[in-house]
A protein has these predicted regions:
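N-terminal catalytic or cofactor-binding beta/alpha core of small enzyme domains
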Residues: 1-152
Length: 152
Protein backbone atom coordinates (compact mmCIF):
# COMPACT_ATOMS: atom_id res chain seq x y z
CA UNK A 1 0.00 0.00 0.00
CA UNK A 2 1.22 3.45 -0.89
CA UNK A 3 1.99 5.51 2.23
CA UNK A 4 0.50 8.61 0.62
CA UNK A 5 -2.86 6.82 0.66
CA UNK A 6 -2.73 6.09 4.39
CA UNK A 7 -2.97 8.24 7.50
CA UNK A 8 -2.01 6.64 10.80
CA UNK A 9 -3.05 7.80 14.26
CA UNK A 10 -0.65 5.60 16.16
CA UNK A 11 -1.73 1.98 16.38
CA UNK A 12 -5.28 2.77 17.43
CA UNK A 13 -6.93 3.54 14.10
CA UNK A 14 -5.88 3.72 10.48
CA UNK A 15 -7.59 5.63 7.69
CA UNK A 16 -6.87 4.44 4.16
CA UNK A 17 -7.63 6.67 1.15
CA UNK A 18 -8.89 9.57 3.29
CA UNK A 19 -9.58 11.78 0.28
CA UNK A 20 -11.10 9.08 -1.93
CA UNK A 21 -13.85 10.32 -4.23
CA UNK A 22 -16.34 7.52 -3.52
CA UNK A 23 -19.31 8.37 -1.29
CA UNK A 24 -18.76 4.96 0.34
CA UNK A 25 -16.93 4.75 3.67
CA UNK A 26 -15.82 1.29 4.77
CA UNK A 27 -15.33 0.53 8.46
CA UNK A 28 -13.47 -2.51 9.82
CA UNK A 29 -13.78 -2.63 13.61
CA UNK A 30 -12.10 -6.02 14.11
CA UNK A 31 -9.14 -5.58 11.75
CA UNK A 32 -6.34 -6.29 14.22
CA UNK A 33 -5.32 -8.58 17.07
CA UNK A 34 -2.73 -6.07 18.32
CA UNK A 35 -2.44 -5.41 22.05
CA UNK A 36 0.06 -2.87 23.40
CA UNK A 37 2.66 -4.44 25.72
CA UNK A 38 1.32 -2.45 28.67
CA UNK A 39 -1.80 -4.67 28.64
CA UNK A 40 0.27 -7.86 29.14
CA UNK A 41 -1.79 -9.64 26.46
CA UNK A 42 -4.78 -9.43 28.83
CA UNK A 43 -3.43 -12.62 30.40
CA UNK A 44 -4.20 -14.67 27.26
CA UNK A 45 -2.15 -17.35 25.53
CA UNK A 46 -0.77 -16.75 22.05
CA UNK A 47 -3.24 -19.25 20.59
CA UNK A 48 -6.19 -17.31 21.99
CA UNK A 49 -4.72 -13.95 20.90
CA UNK A 50 -4.35 -15.24 17.34
CA UNK A 51 -7.84 -16.75 17.21
CA UNK A 52 -11.16 -15.30 16.13
CA UNK A 53 -11.87 -14.30 19.72
CA UNK A 54 -9.35 -11.42 19.43
CA UNK A 55 -10.13 -10.22 15.88
CA UNK A 56 -11.68 -11.21 12.54
CA UNK A 57 -8.83 -12.83 10.60
CA UNK A 58 -8.99 -11.78 6.96
CA UNK A 59 -11.42 -8.91 7.51
CA UNK A 60 -8.79 -6.23 6.94
CA UNK A 61 -7.64 -7.83 3.68
CA UNK A 62 -11.21 -7.91 2.38
CA UNK A 63 -11.81 -4.32 3.50
CA UNK A 64 -8.58 -3.12 1.85
CA UNK A 65 -9.49 -4.90 -1.40
CA UNK A 66 -12.95 -3.31 -1.36
CA UNK A 67 -11.42 0.07 -0.59
CA UNK A 68 -9.18 -0.25 -3.65
CA UNK A 69 -11.96 -1.58 -5.88
CA UNK A 70 -14.42 1.15 -4.88
CA UNK A 71 -11.77 3.87 -4.44
CA UNK A 72 -13.36 4.38 -1.04
CA UNK A 73 -12.11 5.52 2.34
CA UNK A 74 -11.50 2.75 4.87
CA UNK A 75 -11.33 3.27 8.63
CA UNK A 76 -9.81 0.27 10.42
CA UNK A 77 -9.20 -0.37 14.10
CA UNK A 78 -5.60 -1.08 14.98
CA UNK A 79 -6.27 -2.89 18.26
CA UNK A 80 -7.85 -6.16 19.35
CA UNK A 81 -11.57 -6.15 19.99
CA UNK A 82 -10.74 -7.61 23.40
CA UNK A 83 -9.11 -4.33 24.49
CA UNK A 84 -12.08 -2.38 23.16
CA UNK A 85 -14.71 -3.62 20.73
CA UNK A 86 -15.10 -0.47 18.64
CA UNK A 87 -18.57 -1.38 17.38
CA UNK A 88 -19.95 -1.11 20.92
CA UNK A 89 -20.62 2.04 22.97
CA UNK A 90 -18.70 2.57 26.23
CA UNK A 91 -21.64 1.58 28.43
CA UNK A 92 -22.00 -1.83 26.74
CA UNK A 93 -20.68 -4.75 28.80
CA UNK A 94 -19.25 -6.28 25.61
CA UNK A 95 -17.10 -3.24 24.85
CA UNK A 96 -14.44 -4.74 27.16
CA UNK A 97 -15.67 -8.31 27.71
CA UNK A 98 -14.66 -10.39 30.71
CA UNK A 99 -15.59 -13.45 28.62
CA UNK A 100 -15.68 -13.88 24.85
CA UNK A 101 -16.84 -17.01 23.08
CA UNK A 102 -15.46 -19.83 25.27
CA UNK A 103 -12.62 -17.84 26.83
CA UNK A 104 -12.31 -15.88 30.04
CA UNK A 105 -10.40 -12.63 29.47
CA UNK A 106 -8.40 -12.13 32.71
CA UNK A 107 -7.24 -8.62 31.85
CA UNK A 108 -10.85 -7.46 31.50
CA UNK A 109 -12.16 -8.91 34.77
CA UNK A 110 -13.06 -6.34 37.41
CA UNK A 111 -12.19 -3.23 35.40
CA UNK A 112 -12.80 -0.06 37.37
CA UNK A 113 -14.74 2.86 35.92
CA UNK A 114 -11.42 4.73 35.61
CA UNK A 115 -9.87 1.85 33.64
CA UNK A 116 -12.92 1.61 31.36
CA UNK A 117 -12.80 5.37 30.79
CA UNK A 118 -9.07 5.21 30.00
CA UNK A 119 -9.67 2.53 27.36
CA UNK A 120 -12.66 4.40 25.97
CA UNK A 121 -10.55 7.55 25.62
CA UNK A 122 -7.54 5.70 24.20
CA UNK A 123 -9.29 3.41 21.72
CA UNK A 124 -12.99 4.10 21.14
CA UNK A 125 -12.96 7.89 20.91
CA UNK A 126 -10.14 8.10 18.32
CA UNK A 127 -11.83 5.38 16.26
CA UNK A 128 -15.22 7.12 16.36
CA UNK A 129 -13.55 10.45 15.53
CA UNK A 130 -11.91 8.90 12.46
CA UNK A 131 -15.22 7.41 11.32
CA UNK A 132 -16.94 10.74 11.93
CA UNK A 133 -14.28 12.61 9.96
CA UNK A 134 -14.60 10.19 7.05
CA UNK A 135 -18.39 10.45 7.02
CA UNK A 136 -18.38 14.19 7.59
CA UNK A 137 -16.42 14.83 4.42
CA UNK A 138 -19.17 13.29 2.27
CA UNK A 139 -22.68 14.18 1.31
CA UNK A 140 -24.64 11.29 2.71
CA UNK A 141 -28.18 10.43 1.73
CA UNK A 142 -28.30 7.45 4.08
CA UNK A 143 -26.32 4.79 5.87
CA UNK A 144 -26.02 1.05 5.44
CA UNK A 145 -24.24 -0.97 8.10
CA UNK A 146 -23.29 -4.30 6.52
CA UNK A 147 -21.96 -7.01 8.80
CA UNK A 148 -21.15 -10.13 6.83
CA UNK A 149 -21.13 -13.33 8.82
CA UNK A 150 -19.69 -16.68 7.83
CA UNK A 151 -22.29 -19.35 7.04
CA UNK A 152 -23.38 -21.32 10.10
Amino acid sequence: MNHSQTQDAGQVVRTVRPGAPSPVVLVCEHASAFMPASFDNLGLSEDVRRSHVAWDPGALGVAEALSALLDATLVASGISRLLYDCNRPPEAEGAMPARSEIYDIPGNVGLTEAQRKARTDAFYRPFRAAVGAALGSRRVGGYAHLRPRPPA
